[in-house]
């Protein structure tokens, strides 16, 4: 049976920053640029995606395909077509291909100005 064991530290490597709060954008840049998947694409990729037991055993990060990318940044040769295709396919499977693009530090500041950013809130905002 699958049992979820909460981890005491999500990012054990001090060099790994959280892509959510953008505290260490340089840590994400190799993965983001080579995969061409934006922050919003990754976030949307993870929303509602079930995690299997293998996922938790294999990845010590909590954000799925981003964790695979970050885990392999220490091994540049691993960042090849196979891993790239896997991460990109994960987000495309969740209908996030429209949010793909290189990570930009201005993305979080000007996220509402992005053409491909379609939050569910916009529907309520326009209809109210």
Curated annotation (Swiss-Prot):
GO biological process: viral translational frameshifting
Ranges for region Disordered: 1-27, 92-128
Domain of life: Viruses
Biased composition (Polar residues): 18-27
Cleaved signal peptide residues: none
Compositional bias segments (type: Basic and acidic residues): 111-128
Coiled-coil ranges per UniProt: none
Family of the protein in this entry: Belongs to the encephalomyocarditis virus protein 2B* family.
Protein name: Protein 2B*
């Amino acid at each position: 049976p699958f049992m979820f064991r909460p981890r005491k530290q999500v990012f054990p490597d001090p060099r790994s920053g959280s892509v959510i709060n953008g505290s260490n954008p340089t840590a994400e840049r190799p993965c983001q640029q080579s995969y061409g998947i934006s922050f919003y694409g990754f976030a949307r990729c993870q929303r509602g995606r079930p995690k299997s037991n293998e996922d938790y055993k294999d990845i010590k990060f909590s954000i799925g395909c981003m964790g695979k990318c970050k885990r392999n940044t220490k091994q540049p040769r691993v960042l090849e077509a196979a891993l790239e295709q896997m991460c990109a396919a994960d987000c495309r499977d969740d209908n996030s291909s429209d949010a793909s693009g290189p990570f930009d530090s201005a993305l979080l500041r000007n996220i509402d100005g992005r053409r491909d950013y379609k939050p569910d809130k916009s529907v309520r905002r326009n209809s109210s």
